Amino acid sequence: MKFIKETKEGVLIMIYVQPKAKKNAIEGVDGWRGRLKVRIAAPPVEGKANKEVVKFFSKLLGAEVNIVRGETSREKDLLVKGLSVEEVRKKLGV
């Protein structure tokens, strides 16, 4: 799976965010972009969607999650600390 990579710092998850959705959810894999497609209810205003992305993935994975790339873009890279690639895949259901 191209959208999940192991690094020295932790596991990198590459996502594509669709803000202002009805609810927060993982939509599946965007094959064209090679990223995990995620719907987020928060609007992309004043960092609200970014905060919601971090909160959503932190709760889902039960680990520390930070945005390391794409603060102002829909394409974001998340760094997950304290989990292996296998654990992340299992918790994401992919």
Swiss-Prot record:
SUPFAM superfamilies according to UniProt: YggU-like
GO cellular component: cytoplasm
InterPro entries: DUF167, YggU-like_sf
UniProt-listed HAMAP family: UPF0235
Entry similarity comment: Belongs to the UPF0235 family.
Protein name: UPF0235 protein TK0768
